């Protein structure tokens, strides 16, 4: 039988499908996702869960003119498949390939770029208000998950949309089964009744008639209380109604017919409406259904032709988690905080061993930072483990609530530097630059996983804010000698040499080691310094380099502006340094998706490129 999926390229192609065809298409899409994403890597279980929801949205709305915003965006694969991008999945999340998130520059059907959570309602509301001011006619749809709805930004947007009654449709994709579908028939009946034209006209007429007298107003008030009491029993989210947003649901997010009926009617509802759909993460793939978190993001299938390298022992996340557990055994005031990332940040085991000292605040980085500040102000030693890209969401709180008060909060910044496949929204290349400008903040970086325990212990004992930044994954050079004693503001000379000194921080120190081996074959033997401290820099060592006549090359997995290299350059200018200096890092641009090794090579930060930079300097 000919594949339906192969005959579909654009949203309008769905209009001719009957119920049987749509059901068949759902199965074909799931099979395609499982086969394709298993090869390239990507977000799997979340996309398997929204197949029917996406199909229903695309059959019910016209996304040639209607606009859709996908919160976070990693559940947009089905939408991409059905908007002419199916063939691009062979290069999903690869360098110059199809993005794993909505991208306006990728398709006319992508109306807003996303990557971080809780932004869709604000963005959709902005589009809706632009539509109204320009006197245009189209529907704006924001799709947000139950997890993203915990973000403060989403709640701020709900408050705004409900207050001004702006017309838009919000789809709450609840894939946690947190609200049972057993409300069943009565809920469906009330939803159908409340969407009906007769009900809304009658409601308006009654309010108009009775509202003209004091007795009538009293009757309306009593009727409203009775109605609210019933709704509290059968509709699980009076919360939305109280914010001024009409609530419909919950409805089965895998029942296309039921969703079509609801979606076709809400377009005519004036004001904001939220439709609560319940979906199953990993639907149609038994392994993902049993372990949706495990299959949330899957790695690419290994190339059988490539010889597997022997990786170093632990990931940085694992090393951090183990170190914190050991420290917590001795330091009873130590507590751990995460913003919905216990697995990714290495805190899962800590949460099991010390549940009363572990705090997962949900997708709420701003709250997490100030929570840590409050704990520190009252004698605890909080450690906030967070991805670099997400810490920037709590920028003001780090300044206002932590640094101004000089509170002892430790920031364990995971995924610092290039992270690869998720692209611009997830690269961790700015934390050094924005943290360096904050008074009282100290920034350190381990050169290897074995250095994390001593560095973390030092940070926790320091009575002021400390940020420890480390990359995703494992070391690429194993068995480096790890510092056991950390001295404030002091760098480490890890390899002596002549003529030029390479100053590198974090993983870039390992790249410097590999570059040195290449350079030695060409008659150049650089000195290598580990910038253990990114802030403050080791001014005394820099002055010694000047006196000894070294040229200097700095390497960092961060943007150059505001980074380590700029701090070094500033001090060298102050001491009238006359040697050659070169700064390696990322220029003033966002770094796209791609394999980490490819990106390092593209931006001149791999060992070969580093050695070539030095060779050009002398040739």
From Swiss-Prot:
Binding site for Mg(2+): 146, 175
Swiss-Prot/TrEMBL keywords: Isoprene biosynthesis, Magnesium, Metal-binding, Thiamine biosynthesis, Thiamine pyrophosphate, Transferase
Pathway annotation: Metabolic intermediate biosynthesis; 1-deoxy-D-xylulose 5-phosphate biosynthesis; 1-deoxy-D-xylulose 5-phosphate from D-glyceraldehyde 3-phosphate and pyruvate: step 1/1
Cofactor: Mg(2+); thiamine diphosphate
Reaction catalysed by this enzyme: D-glyceraldehyde 3-phosphate + pyruvate + H(+) = 1-deoxy-D-xylulose 5-phosphate + CO2
Domain of life: Bacteria
One GO biological process term: thiamine biosynthetic process
Binding site for thiamine diphosphate: 74, 115-117, 147-148, 175, 285, 365
Biased composition (Basic and acidic residues): 302-312
Start and end residues of each stretch annotated as Disordered: 289-312
Details of cofactor binding: Binds 1 Mg(2+) ion per subunit. Binds 1 thiamine pyrophosphate per subunit.
Enzyme kind, highest EC tier: transferase
Any GO CC annotation of this UniProt entry: cytosol
Keyword set includes rRNA-binding: no
Family annotation (SMART domains): Transket_pyr (SM00861)
Keyword presence, Transferase: yes
UniProt cross-references to InterPro entries, sorted A to Z: Dxylulose-5-P_synthase, THDP-binding, Transketo_C/PFOR_II, Transketolase-like_Pyr-bd, Transketolase_C, Transketolase_CS
EC number: 2.2.1.7
GO MF term (any one): thiamine pyrophosphate binding
Quaternary organization: Homodimer.
Family note: Belongs to the transketolase family. DXPS subfamily.
Function text: Catalyzes the acyloin condensation reaction between C atoms 2 and 3 of pyruvate and glyceraldehyde 3-phosphate to yield 1-deoxy-D-xylulose-5-phosphate (DXP).
The name this protein goes by in its record: 1-deoxy-D-xylulose-5-phosphate synthase
Organism: Clostridium botulinum (strain Eklund 17B / Type B)
